[in-house]
């Protein structure tokens, strides 16, 4: 009986861990060629019991985002720096509880191999927010993409 309880507790912990790991904003693909063009997809889940209505993104330095995939019912407000480069965006719409959406972006990667970090804040209709800006392994990690060197 004790063995069964330990197994049940271990299984419950594993399910909770997997569930929480999937609740994060993600960027796909997680690997891309340095200097290459890429279609990035931001996957946004809503595991709260209230609507999520805004996602604010800050793009990695050196990444040149140049187009956004339209999403029915959502608007995209683009933020630019002094040079006119797109440095972030705000998506506004309705993401109902326990649903997810994917938002596409076209970009040119920085030339240098290494990691680039995206930062997102997800806002909810009850006034709360989740900031996906933490280090890997934190409760709310920022999505990271590894840029691989290309041999030419």
Q: What positions do the PLM features span?
A:
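Low-complexity, intrinsically disordered segments enriched in Ser/Thr together with acidic residues
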Residues: 94-114
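Low-complexity, serine/threonine/proline/glycine-rich extracellular segments that form mucin-like
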Residues: 30-68
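A surface/secretory-pathway sequence property marking extracellular, secreted
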Residues: 60-87, 143-149
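Bacterial N-terminal signal peptides that target proteins for export
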Residues: 1-10
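Extracytoplasmic/periplasmic copper-protein system
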Residues: 34, 123-152
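Short, solvent-exposed loop/turn segments enriched in Ser/Thr/Gly
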Residues: 35-40, 101-102, 115-118
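Bacterial N-terminal signal peptides
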Residues: 9-17
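Sec/Tat signal peptide C-region and signal peptidase I cleavage site
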Residues: 18-23
């Amino acid at each position: 009986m004790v063995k069964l309880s330990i197994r049940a507790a271990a299984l419950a912990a594993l399910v909770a861990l997997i569930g929480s790991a999937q609740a994060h904003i993600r960027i796909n693909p997680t690997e891309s060629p340095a200097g290459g063009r890429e279609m990035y997809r931001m996957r946004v889940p809503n595991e709260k019991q209230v609507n999520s209505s805004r996602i604010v993104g800050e793009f990695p330095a050196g990444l040149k985002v140049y187009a956004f995939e339209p999403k029915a019912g959502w608007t995209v407000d683009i933020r630019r720096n002094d040079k006119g480069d797109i440095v972030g965006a705000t998506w506004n719409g309705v993401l109902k509880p326990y649903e997810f959406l994917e938002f596409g972006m076209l970009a040119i990667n920085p030339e240098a191999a290494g990691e680039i970090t995206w930062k997102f804040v997800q806002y909810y209709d009850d006034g709360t927010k989740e900031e996906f800006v933490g280090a890997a392994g934190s409760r709310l990690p920022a999505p990271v993409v590894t840029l691989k060197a290309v041999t030419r």
